[in-house]
Regions:
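Domain-level signal for soluble alpha/beta catalytic cores
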Residues: 1-211
């Protein structure tokens, strides 16, 4: 099948490429590197018919990053390096219909999302990540499913790590694609034990600065 665009699969097929990218960030002074696992849950991987490899991809992604972070921490213990397990938004949305003629339709349920996320996060935790980073959040309901999955995965794996969130806004008014302001988003996740909240993607650092 066609694997173009499936960058996560490189953790299994060409790990040296991912190692080289991590090394360049560490050489540049990065304190935290992200695993190459942004799309590595079965919802997104189903597009490539490799959804059954999700656990392996995440495990490899975490171990590759962990090994390099540890190498650089050993070189300079005064500057410890950390690994964040990258968890993307998937290619589906819980809050909006993909069908303009049927606004009630949803391509995925909360439970389906949570299940896919939990599988991914358990493998990332097993591989040794220091934190879970739920990023490029465009739908608060997707994010809630991911947060729920993270707490479940940590409990199951017996490992509690910081939970980091990063939102993407889709207009200069600072709203997410699902229509929430940043304040509204914060209110919707304030129940969770979140370590940090940031912004990514969107339309660049300069335009994001006011938020």
């Amino acid at each position: 099948g066609q694997m173009k665009g499936n960058n996560d699969l490189l953790c299994l097929t060409a790990p040296h490429i991912i190692q080289d990218i991590h090394r360049k960030y560490l050489e540049a002074g990065a304190d935290i590197i992200e695993t190459n696992s942004f799309n590595a849950q079965r919802i997104s991987m189903a597009d490539y018919h490799v959804e059954d490899y999700c656990r392996e991809i995440n495990l490899a992604a975490a171990r590759i990053a962990r090994e390099l972070a540890d190498e650089y921490t050993t070189k300079n213990p005064e500057k410890p390096r950390f690994v964040a397990g990258s968890v993307g938004p998937t290619n589906k949305t819980c809050s909006m219909s993909p069908d303009v003629n049927n606004p009630a339709f949803r391509a995925i349920t909360f439970d389906e999302l949570a299940e896919a996320y939990q599988e991914q996060m358990e493998a990332l935790l097993e591989g040794g990540v220091d934190a879970i980073l739920i990023e490029t959040i465009f739908d608060s309901l997707n994010a809630k499913a991911a947060v729920y999955a993270a707490t479940e995965a940590m409990e199951k794996m017996g490992r509690e790590v910081p939970l980091m969130l990063s939102i993407t806004v889709s207009d200069t008014g600072g709203r997410t694609l699902s229509g929430q302001t940043l304040d509204a988003f914060l209110a919707s996740v304030q129940h969770a034990p979140i370590f940090s909240i940031g912004l990514n993607c969107s339309f660049g650092a300069k335009q994001l600065k006011p938020f």
